């Protein structure tokens, strides 16, 4: 079995043949994914994240995909972990919805996952790499900036993130 560090390295290499949701045949089991963000007291922000995770479940090659918030809101990592196990997961990959490695990725999320796993004997888990640094994020930054600048210039509607907020204005 690969170490958690090896699994983190594979998760940071999206073009690696072993990084596409499959465990080796001798490992077996059902893989679940928990996508975790920081969490906020703003209900609409949490709802937007949870909607994103539900939509991503249709694209990800895993039978179980759950949202979780690290703090400040439910579902927590512990409750998402419980739901994954109840749905039949034997391995849980926790995907941080964070741009870079920091204390949350290095310490907080692993500690919360360890506590959640304590009640589930035989369940394996890992915390995957954060989203960046990944050069594909530059494409997203470029697209977002171009759209926002086109909007304030009157050439495009507001993007879905800003729609109705009154925030996408040139001051």
Predicted regions and their residues:
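Active-site-proximal alpha-helix that buttresses catalytic centers in soluble enzyme cores
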Residues: 1-171
């Amino acid at each position: 079995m690969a170490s958690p560090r090896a699994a983190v390295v594979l998760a940071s290499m999206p073009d690696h043949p072993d990084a596409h949701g499959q465990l080796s045949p001798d490992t077996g089991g059902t893989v679940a994914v928990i996508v975790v963000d920081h969490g906020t007291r703003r209900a609409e922000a949490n709802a937007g994240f949870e909607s994103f995770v539900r939509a991503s479940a249709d694209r990800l090659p895993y039978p179980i995909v759950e949202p979780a918030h690290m703090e400040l809101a439910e579902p927590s990592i512990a409750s998402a972990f419980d739901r994954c196990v109840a749905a039949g997961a034997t391995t849980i990959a926790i995907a941080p919805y964070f741009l870079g490695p920091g204390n949350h990725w290095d310490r907080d999320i692993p500690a919360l996952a360890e506590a959640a796993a304590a009640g589930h004997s035989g369940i394996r888990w890992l915390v995957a790499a954060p989203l960046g640094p990944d050069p594909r994020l530059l494409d997203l930054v470029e697209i977002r900036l171009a759209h926002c600048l086109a909007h304030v210039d009157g050439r495009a509607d507001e993007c879905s993130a800003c729609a109705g907020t009154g925030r996408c204005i040139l001051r």
